Amino acid sequence: MAALRVSRLSWTSSRITANTRLGDGELVDIQREVKLGGSIHSKGVLILASFLASRYAAEQPLSLGASLVFEQTYGQVEGDSASVAELCALLSSLANAPIRQSLAVTGSVDQFGRVQAIGAVNEKIEGY
């Protein structure tokens, strides 16, 4: 399991955890499964799954199962600004390499693994 604290657009921060294991290539978005993930957030997780599959399963099926969750978040999660943090948490879990909890991360990732430009920078910094 890997954990990473992420600064959300609002005035709070959240802890994202990832769990990886042997599996069939499925990336479970727990927020979506319990109907707490909005469509843009779900799109971001699907993009992560596409990136992981293209990077690590180009020649053979991905024998990995993974899950992602915003810990102790009970309201709707929306937007793709946490996808960099989610990717970091997944890679941390895969490598069994903990991430320092003093870091704040925001931003989205495209399906090629490239970090994209972020918006509302001032609000995110002030909110953290």
Feature-to-residue mapping (PLM):
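Peripheral, non-AAA+ core regions of ATP-driven protein-machinery
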Residues: 1, 14-128
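Short, flexible loop/turn motifs enriched in small residues
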Residues: 9-13
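Catalytic or ion-coupling anion/metal-binding cores of large enzyme and transporter domains
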Residues: 1-7
